[in-house]
Amino acid sequence: VIAMVRCTQCGAASRPVGGGMVLQGHGTRSRQVRGPAQPGQQAQVRVVQVRRYRCQACGGTCTVVPWEVTWRRLYSVAAMAWALALWGLVGMGMEAVRRLVNPWKHTGASEAGRWRTPLRWLRAVHQGQLLVQVHTMRPWPPHWHPRKAAAHVASVVAGYAPPAAPSPPLSVQAFLGAARAQ
């Protein structure tokens, strides 16, 4: 069980020395996570339970989520890294990547043949809101073409993958390294 160390709103310690609990359990809620559980598996929508805490000092709430869940994103962080790797490193078309990562088989007419979501992910990485280690350790120039930036992000994230013998393809390493790059 993971507990919060401090309030994300006011910074109060969850349990100050000699004091009572400041962050108290405030129930759970369901959260969707989209994408495959492992590279090459069928993309799916999974529902996970996340734990909520309420701060007795400021009244704010905070949520503890599994490693694969990231703030304001429906896809798992591993699925996002894998999609960027497939597009940037492997050279797959965006529609082919979408079929592997997106659990929805049908799209609206305005989205036929394209998928803009990975470009939003790239922007979030560049702004330090997603895969923070990439932005911190290896930022890229803003004039780079999005596919080149995606390859760069995937390469950096792959470096965080745990060692394995034999070494899996770089796109799989990006999937596996995403949690550590977050």
Each model region followed by its residue ranges:
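Extended alpha-helical scaffolding regions
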Residues: 163-182
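Short, conserved DNA-binding cores of transcription-related domains
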Residues: 1-69
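Short, positively charged, Gly/Tyr-enriched micro-motifs
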Residues: 56-154, 161-164, 171
